[in-house]
């Protein structure tokens, strides 16, 4: 693949023009538009820009950091500048994670097309690289960085600089001995092939060699039977382990003769352990593997709070980009706060703050385009409506006109009224969640009508409560006097009606309802009534009535949202709300941190569909489960985690070439309160390339079905807080035991390949302190 890129750099016309460089306009805001010189570097993997051709600057971004290229027509920012620049001359570079997009305007349509085609070609090539090809590319980049005089050879001084780039501080005498061993030509320099041998010596995996030799009778190879023993005893691959061993040998043994003899060499063994088959995340959990035909209330649903915000809650930017990013992350419930806007057009923003505004119809157009790109399971549009009657009519018109057949506007045929539809039944549909005027038939089935309370938005926003009071349906006493009238008509209210029937009619299965008590909800609400809770209210209910909360959530949906005091868009721990079966635990997805890592970890499974089936005891309306007083169906288990080693950890501060990390690993367990705990290794001084810890931890787990495991690697600091290096979070139910690699992710959730840690995990019935 790497050679293919090098070939394309000399033959592809788009890439040739990109290597010559192009002056383009970089656009950050409506007023910030600067000319910059962009050029694809000779390695074909990095792009830099400067004020002019002679600018001295480092590469601005790597092709591996780019997710996709968008046309100018799809850029919210460039559309605002259509009178200044033709949209056909613009394009957007979309990066992985939360890194801001890069909007560019070329001097001509042809120039824009050249860069769009060329960049997308390289992005697609990188996406198809396997582990070895990615490693080859990384080695090539390191060699080029170390070869300061560009003579295609590396001196020992350049090799010393490389060690610092690779995040390792090594004794000079030992480093020189490795350098001499690799210098087969005895020229006191290394060519590219000799450099590969130098790299292998630097990254020698002694711990894996020892593991290999423990199962190999001749210390040179694993026979088929020896490999089967390893898979069965250590990797817990008890089912069809013989067939699996054959497949893995065919897949990872580099020697054709070894494959014919059905043996695995040391290199093949290492390739297996570093592959997806040797990863801690069970590959069987990556596609859709759960039953998707159960009622919506039986699933955790990946949910976003104030989806339109890219920053804080007070003066942050509102943008349709927030919806695109959330949907890209697998979000299946987005929030839309609507307010009256100019020219009769509703706008979306965080009301009574300084956040910017976007048009409601632009949000809908974005949802129509991106709703089902990452998941085709139903998308819930959580509507927080603050508009007047007239603009609500406009909202209803836009919902129907823009979303078209994607919008679920009527109940499903042959769907029982007392059972919520399933994700499978609702595939490809957008559901509106919001307030709904009640019909006489519904009122008659209710024992009483309660005064509506505030149920959505910020804890500090009185407007919602005011709206709810105004849109309150008439009391049961008033309703009884109207029984002779047409039952399909909406009820008149004692005060001026605020909620528009046109908009109300589009709320089909997801009607918001104020929460009074669990008893009231059970006796008065239907399965399609949804109550919303602030995080603090939900926490109180969990502490005071955990089991009732579990039963409530087995029967109907609920939504939890962050406190309005979180003006910085920080997040709360979703785990404690999942523990009682809350389905829609809304997160500020624009904010990285441990809370979002836990959220991403849960929804990484099941095809990234945004729907995860809750454990059986959280789907039973008669469940006796209480997370505050868990009684395990089985004997408490012991999770054993041995943190063995780390590989190619990135620098915390890449601008400081001479600094090297002192890494440590913290293992965090999240679940019911009794299971939540963490343990930490000691730190390894000055080694980011192959640190070794070899420390073992024991975690007692009462409710493994709810447990989440998070590995965090940090750079130890004596004077301040330890700096974040990388992390990986996964559900206990998706964890493969045995010797596994944990692929690290950045704060933004993007891959830090090839950075990883090597661990051993297993489950024990009784606490046995012997080393695994």
UniProtKB/Swiss-Prot annotation:
One of its GO terms (biological process) is acrosome reaction. Ca(2+) 5 binds at residues 715-716. Keywords: Calcium, Cytoplasm, Endoplasmic reticulum, Hydrolase, Lipid degradation, Lipid metabolism, Membrane, Metal-binding, Nucleus, Phosphoprotein, Repeat, Transducer. CDD domains: C2_PLC_like. It is a peripheral membrane protein. A motif (GBA) lies at residues 213-243. Residues 290-435 form the PI-PLC X-box domain. The keyword Metal-binding applies. This is 1-phosphatidylinositol 4,5-bisphosphate phosphodiesterase delta-4.
